[in-house]
Swiss-Prot record:
Keyword vocabulary terms for this entry: Antiport, Chloroplast, Hydrogen ion transport, Ion transport, Membrane, Plastid, Plastid inner membrane, Potassium, Potassium transport, Transmembrane, Transmembrane helix, Transport
Function noted in UniProt: Contributes to K(+)/H(+) antiport activity by supporting proton efflux to control proton extrusion and homeostasis in chloroplasts in a light-dependent manner to modulate photosynthesis. Prevents excessive induction of non-photochemical quenching (NPQ) under continuous-light conditions. Indirectly promotes efficient inorganic carbon uptake into chloroplasts.
Lineage start: Eukaryota, Viridiplantae, Streptophyta, Charophyceae, Charales
Transmembrane segments: 196-216, 297-317, 344-364, 371-391
Keyword Chloroplast: yes
Membrane topology reported for the UniProt record: Multi-pass membrane protein
InterPro entries listed in its UniProt record: CemA (IPR004282)
Protein name as it appears in the record: Potassium/proton antiporter CemA
Main location: plastid
Family in the record: Belongs to the CemA family.
A single Gene Ontology CC term: chloroplast inner membrane
């Protein structure tokens, strides 16, 4: 009997909990309807209000469904454990549970409330979706209007009226309409989303190509290239590799003969053993440069894979790229004039400063070695003598044409620091 009483108590508690939750749903719906008709209702924030109400309603709906599930499970156990009472007694648990008018009324009430609230939520969501669609269309037209204006610069246009006056008037209008808190909240959410999305996209753009090329290289490319090379018996030596290999072989041969002379073992060595030793040196040298040739081909293929991966990311996530560009511009323009001038001066000195030719020479030599070539001094000298000059001209044109229009104070600070 204790088990029967415990199960019956669970049935009553579950049904009571579901019934109380349904009454809360009914009350919340009525309160929201009264709030919409009151003077405190703000049409600009009804979306946030409905989102909160929708969240609370879903929470109570989940409580009802979970309580009804416990109710049904407990009823099944009760019916399973009392077959004799079900068939012979009108006072049995079966009769009390399934033929009780109060229980039937509560279940009908709960079902009606659930159906009504789901219909109401569906209508509100459809209306909410239509409003969002209209807002997106308005925003799209607004952005198209901005993009069509070629003379627009960064975030603020340059007109006859100074920008400080327009900003002051806009803030004054915002204060009068009482929307300062709402605008600040939206700006904060937008800035937070912009920063997080930009940082995520930046890490994704840097790490994903590196991970893809590394996995492709380690898992399949190295093994396939070695098998193909050994099977085809290719001896791929370009002109630069031949020069390097020949020079290294001459150095190794000189060291070998010097070692024989200093140790006074030349008389004890036969001509055949000396030739065999030199042959082994040549074979080891060929194996070394064969591996370098394989490594060069692997690096070329992985470079193409990395470039292809970056291109795919840029094509797929164009919106994220736009957000990243906007965030970087906003970050740069939010700095003080001194910091802006400092970063511009730092970048220009690194790329086109007095000591920059040495850095360009090192960079060009690394590129030559990466592709398996001997650094060509003529090409390196030509690049170092022309590219920084072209880059310096482009930077000066950018400062004169673009930066001088946006913020003349940055240009003045830059020239003062440069002098």
């Amino acid at each position: 009997m204790k088990l029967y009483e415990w199960l019956l108590q669970r049935v009553r508690k579950a049904l009571k909990k579901a019934y109380e939750a349904s009454k809360e749903i009914k009350t919340m719906k009525q309160d929201f309807s009264l709030y919409k008709k009151s003077d405190f209702f703000d049409t600009t924030s009804w979306e946030n209000s409905f989102s909160y109400i929708d969240f609370e309603l879903n929470k109570y709906k989940w409580i009802i469904k979970y309580s009804l599930f416990k109710y049904r499970v407990s009823v099944v156990f009760l019916l399973f454990l009392s077959p004799f009472e079900i068939s012979h007694s009108k006072d049995s648990l079966y009769f009390n549970i399934l033929h009780n008018k109060k229980i039937h009324m509560q279940l009908s009430w709960i079902k009606k409330v659930i159906d009504d609230i789901e219909t109401w939520q569906k209508k509100k969501r459809d209306f909410f979706y239509l409003q969002q669609t209209k807002n997106k269309q308005k925003q799209k037209k607004f952005h198209l209007g901005i993009l069509s204006n070629i003379d627009s610069i960064a975030y603020e246009t340059i007109g006859f009226i100074p920008r400080s006056i327009t900003r002051t008037l806009y803030r004054f209008k915002t204060e009068l309409t009482g929307k300062t808190a709402l605008i600040l909240f939206r700006e904060f959410r937008f800035a937070k989303y912009q920063a997080l999305a930009s940082i995520q996209y930046g890490f994704f753009l840097l790490l994903l190509p590196w991970i893809v090329t590394l996995l492709f290289k380690k898992l399949s490319l190295e093994y396939l290239m070695n098998v193909w090379w050994n099977k085809s018996s290719i001896q791929l030596f370009n002109a630069s590799q031949k020069k390097i290999a020949l020079k290294r072989f001459q150095n190794m041969e000189d060291i070998f003969w010097l070692d024989l002379i200093t140790k006074e073992t030349l008389e004890n060595k036969s001509q055949y053993s000396i030739s065999l030793k030199i042959h082994d040196m040549i074979i080891s040298l060929v194996e070394i440069y064969t591996q370098k040739s394989i490594y060069t081909i692997i690096e070329l293929i992985t470079d193409f894979i990395g470039i292809f991966t970056i291109t795919v990311i840029l094509c797929i996530a164009k919106k994220r790229l736009t957000v990243l560009n906007s965030w970087l511009q906003e970050l740069f323009y939010s700095l003080s004039d001194t910091m802006k001038a400092f970063f511009i001066l730092l970048i220009t000195d690194l790329c086109i400063g007095f000591h920059s030719p040495h850095g360009w020479e090192v960079l060009i030599e690394l590129v030559w070695e990466h592709f398996g070539f001997v650094p060509n001094q003529y090409i390196t000298s030509f690049f170092v003598s022309t590219f920084p000059v072209v880059l310096d001209t482009m930077v000066k044109y950018w400062i004169f044409r673009h930066l001088n229009r946006i913020s003349p104070s940055i240009v003045v600070t830059y020239h003062s620091m440069n002098e």
